Amino acid sequence: MKKNKLFWILTVVCVLNFAAHLYFYPSLPDIVPTHWGGQVNGWGPKSTVLILAALPFAMLILFEVIRKIDPKHQNFEKFGKVWNLFVVLFTVMMAAFSWLSELAVFGKLPDSSNLVSILVCGGIGVLFIILGNFMPQIKQNYTFGCRTPWALNDEHNWQRTQRMGG
């Protein structure tokens, strides 16, 4: 899939996510849960929900900027599928996590359950497993992968580092 098409698809996902949050925003209480440690143990103003809803789009923009300012940006084309997979997984995961506060407020999450911790840790774990599988395909760049000074200066070292890191 071309990166421009993917960017616009993810932009639509982020906008729809934010619009859905805006739809439910008036029905939220003034204080919403923002942190879980087995059960809700952190609270914040309901505007936090909108900040969390905007975060996936902000990260999507940041990923595009990073791709353009990296001194070895031409290498992104060589491992574009891995980078695109990371951007898709990360953006979708952030959009999904942005719903945890609303789900807790509307009673869709058990209050004294470790479900949130399991979902967040499980999602991040799956992301790392998938990335670990694809890390050997990453070419030299200053943004993505295991970036030690030695690996950045030597192509062979870079390949070995990514393979071991994965």
Each model region followed by its residue ranges:
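Alpha-helical transmembrane segments
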Residues: 10, 42-58, 113-131
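Ordered, amphipathic secondary-structure segments that act as subunit-interaction surfaces
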Residues: 65-114
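Short membrane-interface loop/juxtamembrane segments of multi-pass integral membrane proteins
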Residues: 148-165
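Membrane-water interface of transmembrane alpha-helices
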Residues: 23-26, 57-70, 130-146
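Generic alpha-helical transmembrane segments of integral inner-membrane proteins
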Residues: 11-19, 57, 61, 65, ...
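Active-site and channel-lining beta-strand-loop segments
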Residues: 22-51, 144-153
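Alpha-helical transmembrane segments and their helix-start/interface "positive-inside/aromatic belt" motifs
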Residues: 1-12
